Each structure stands twice: as C-alpha cells, then as structure tokens.
C-alpha cells in the first residue's frame, strides 16, 4: 500500500474527514436514505462500459490539484451531450469542491442532458458517502484502495451493491491489486497509471497489473491516455476500457478530442 502521508492524496483525505463531519451535521444518514427515494433508477454503469469497444468513461472535470483550472469554459450539460454523441460508454463526474472545483449537482445536471450512466468521482471514505452518491444520482462509485482500509473497502462496496450502484476499485500497484481482489468480482478494477508520490505517469503500470488478472476480468486504465498510440498499446494487451478526462477537457471541443483519440466505439 502506498503511504499517503505528505502527498496530495493524504491532504485530500484529511479534508474529506472534515467534510464528512460537516455533512453529517447538515443531513444525517436517515435523511440521506429518504433522499435516495427521490432519485431516478440507476442506468447500469458496468453493463454500459462492457457494451462498447473501446469502452470509454469520459470525465467531466474543471480543475485538478496539479494543473489548476483545466477548463475555464465549464458546462457539464454541454460536455455530457458531446461525450454521448461521440460514443462514450459512461461519464465520470468530479464532485470534490476544494481540490477539483467540482460540485454535487453536476452529476444530476450531466445525467439530465444525456442517457449515459455516471461515476461519482470523489474520495469517498465512509458508507455515508456511498448512500449520498446514490441520492446525488450516481450510477457507480469510486473506491481508492490507497486511502481505505480493507474493512472500509468491504463495507463500502457492500453498501454500494445494496443501493444498486456499481463499484470501480482503483489501484496503483501490485499490493493494492491484491487487496482489491479480495472484494466481490462484481467490482470493476481500475489501474491509475499516475504515481501518487511523484505524479509521473507510466502506462506500463496497467500492462504489468493486467498480467496478474484472469483474462476475463475487465480492467479500466486511468491517467495518461493521450494519443491513439497509447490506446493501441492498451488494446494490444487486451485492455479495452479507459477513463480519460484531461485530454478531453483541455480541448475546445471534447467530442472532437474523443474522436481523435478513440475513433468511433463499436457495440459488442
């Protein structure tokens, strides 16, 4: 497990504990459970991801801690529509406020303007956050192994399945993958190619960890996919699912950037 103290991830997790305490004061778990009843049905994130090749989770992200504001002209509704028209399988929507300038309401806004399922991209630390994600109209949650204990991973993934949410479990190395594989096979596996300490990107991380998986297990490669050659490299190693944000957000037309990178995905 990567030690996250003195890293940006460590700072984010510290802030998330403060945020959780604040949110619990404003709305307790029972209130959030009531709120869930108003949410529309889930759209089937994993099913949609598997239905296309390449299966692309296209990210709606205004800023990042390392790059600052990536997209000043930020319109989640318009971006969601463009992604759907380009052939994305799913959306990833940042809800973290302090580090990524996201917003909770962006999930519902994006979903209202397209038919794609959405991942709540945030740093979740408690089952409360999972139930909250369902209330916010997410179809899938992200669990980052580097900032969660085995008990948290187990408890939060079970909570997600109870609320019909899909789960994307993110790992950075072999040790984290070993922990992730203890969870239900229903979980999707994501490999983040970015080193949390140096922020360097190495696409070989995905290739290396893919070899340790059963060939039938779907793997999502995350971070650093920037050229058609990167996509081809992954596909040559039987990796057909991608999470891409920055490459799209930096361009005036995210849909055109999508097509330049992936072409037109096909139904499988």
From Swiss-Prot:
CDD domains: IGPS
Matches recorded under SUPFAM superfamilies: Ribulose-phoshate binding barrel
Entry EC no(s): 4.1.1.48
One Pfam short name: IGPS
Secretion signal, residue range per the UniProt entry: none
Enzyme class: lyase
Alphabetical list of InterPro entries matching this protein: Aldolase_TIM, Indole-3-glycerol_P_synth, Indole-3-glycerol_P_synth_dom, Indole-3-GlycerolPSynthase_CS, RibuloseP-bd_barrel
Keywords: Amino-acid biosynthesis, Aromatic amino acid biosynthesis, Decarboxylase, Lyase, Tryptophan biosynthesis
HAMAP family recorded: IGPS_B (MF_00134_B)
Sequence similarity: Belongs to the TrpC family.
PANTHER family documented for this protein: INDOLE-3-GLYCEROL-PHOSPHATE SYNTHASE, TRYPTOPHAN BIOSYNTHESIS PROTEIN
Protein name: Indole-3-glycerol phosphate synthase
Organism: Acinetobacter baylyi (strain ATCC 33305 / BD413 / ADP1)
Organism ancestry: Bacteria, Pseudomonadati, Pseudomonadota, Gammaproteobacteria, Moraxellales
């Amino acid at each position: 497990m990567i030690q996250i103290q003195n890293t940006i991830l460590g700072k984010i997790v510290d802030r998330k504990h403060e945020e959780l305490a604040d949110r619990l004061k404003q709305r307790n778990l029972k209130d959030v459970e009531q709120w869930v009843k108003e949410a529309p049905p889930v759209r089937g994130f994993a099913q949609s991801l598997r239905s296309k090749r390449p299966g692309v989770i296209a990210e709606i992200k205004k800023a990042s801690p390392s790059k600052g504001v990536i997209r000043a002209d930020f319109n989640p509704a318009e971006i969601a529509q463009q992604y759907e028209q380009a052939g994305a399988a799913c959306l990833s929507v940042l809800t973290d406020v302090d580090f990524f300038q996201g917003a909770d309401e962006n999930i519902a806004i994006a979903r209202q303007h397209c038919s794609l399922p959405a991942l709540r991209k945030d740093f979740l630390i408690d089952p409360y956050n999972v139930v909250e994600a369902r209330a916010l109209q997410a179809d899938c949650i992200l669990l980052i192994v580097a900032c969660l204990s085995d008990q948290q991973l187990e408890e939060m993934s079970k909570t997600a399945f109870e609320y019909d949410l899909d789960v994307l479990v993110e790992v950075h190395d072999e040790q984290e993958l070993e922990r992730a594989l203890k969870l239900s096979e229903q979980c999707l596996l994501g490999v983040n190619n970015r080193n949390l300490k140096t922020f360097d990107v190495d696409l070989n991380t995905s290739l290396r960890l893919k070899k340790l998986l059963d060939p039938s297990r779907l793997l999502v490669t995350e971070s650093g996919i920037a050229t058609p050659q990167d996509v081809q490299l992954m596909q040559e190693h039987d990796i057909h699912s991608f999470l891409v944000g920055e490459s799209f957000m930096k361009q005036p037309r995210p849909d055109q950037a999508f097509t330049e990178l992936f072409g037109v995905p096909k139904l499988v």
